[in-house]
Amino acid sequence: MSDVLNRFIAYCKVSSQSNPLTADVVPSTESQHQMAEVVAADLRELGAENVVVDEHAYVVAHWPASKGLEDLPTLGFCCHIDTAWQSWGNPVHPQVVTYEGGKLVVGSDREGREVYISPETNPQLEHMVGWQLVTTDGTSLLGGDDKAGIAMLVSLLARYKEHPELKHPRIALAFVPDEEIGHGAALLDLDAFGAAYGYTIDGGPFGEFCYETFNAAEVFVRAHGLSVHTGTAKGQMINASEAIMRFHELLPPAERPEFTEGYDGFFYLERVNGDCESARADYIIRDHDQAKVERRKQLMVDAAAYVNKQIGSEVLSVEIHDQYHNLADIVLKPEYAHLIENARTAYKKVGVEMTCIPMRGGTDGSQLSFRGFPCANLSACYYNAHGVREFVPVPELEGMVDMLEHLVELYTHPQN
């Protein structure tokens, strides 16, 4: 197996899911500390400098510049160590299989149902016949988002160690927790990180490039009702769960994730629970246009007010928090044009045409770019993320390490 494949499989086996229910603590899960220590140990073994793991499971390290290139700006890369919480993620049993075409059964899920991928679910498989794929065994997610990105970066450093003749500026590396629950690397010490600009590696298929993300907010709707014996409830009972249902019905049904694509925004009901006396619904709202996000916020506030007026009591309350912003607002500034053009050139050097897509999500760069680390998003080469059908093609995993080598070499020259 190649170095990057070995590392990827090893990282996948370390469970490190984040948990939105404990998001008030960073990291939200103890397992992310364990993943951070695994990555830090690999960095130290390779000879990276200034390797630090802080109390929040942030890993920061540096790779020194080639001789004569010490005065160039530091190039930064960032990946996240957590995996998604929406699917089972412990234990993870990655497997390497050769795709022979048609339907590929990878295993069975925890209820015994067949788990497979096919050209019907993933048309990209048509050109992957004969390739090795890293898949799940059907019982969990894989974790390519974002452990493929981590493996690529660490493997790149291993290449520099083995081939010191390869030229590169000083490189800063950050591996951060809780990306999947919207934390957005909020506690990354950018002064210690020390990068002038750079990239996150958290995208999908090989060649994908993103400088546009959603603007994002989370919305917490709370209902406080009044429980009365159902036999004598007339004119008295206020059912908190019913109030939440009325509220949800006022949101446009066509603007849900399952009905949207491209630049369409949406409202997403993440979870709901409750009873007569108390109920809650947690939403996220997403849109590439911040003005539309603001309109969505107002619609939810107005919907709650309407329900309260109908009931005749202040049953519903709405709490809104911004999560991240569209990184295009920063990356498209003329002084950062090199982030796009150098990525395009590096992809071409490995025979891939770069595809720019509006990302229907966010990356750590969505916050970091606004905090002073302008960064666009590169491929991590995973497909069907966050579920049991997730897979990573080995040729793409290996090809991205080559792409990163070419990309870094382009930064051995001053940028305009």
Walk through the language-model features, giving the residues of each.
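Phosphate/diphosphate-binding glycine-rich loops and adjacent basic-rich segments that engage nucleotide
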Residues: 200-226, 230-233, 237-241
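Metal-dependent amide/peptide-bond hydrolase catalytic core
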Residues: 240-416
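N-terminal capping segment at the start of a domain
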Residues: 2-29, 134-135, 227, 383-387
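A non-catalytic alpha/beta surface segment that caps or lines the substrate-entry region
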Residues: 23-72, 76-78, 82, 93
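Glycine/charged-rich beta-loop-alpha catalytic/anionic-binding loops adjacent to active sites
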Residues: 125-140, 224-228, 350, 382-386
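Active-site metal-coordination/substrate-binding segment of hydrolases
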Residues: 69-170, 175
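Short, conserved micro-motifs enriched in small and acidic residues
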Residues: 30, 140-151, 234-242, 391-398
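Acidic/histidine-rich catalytic neighborhood of metal-dependent amide-processing enzymes
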Residues: 125-213, 254-270, 274, 281-288, ...
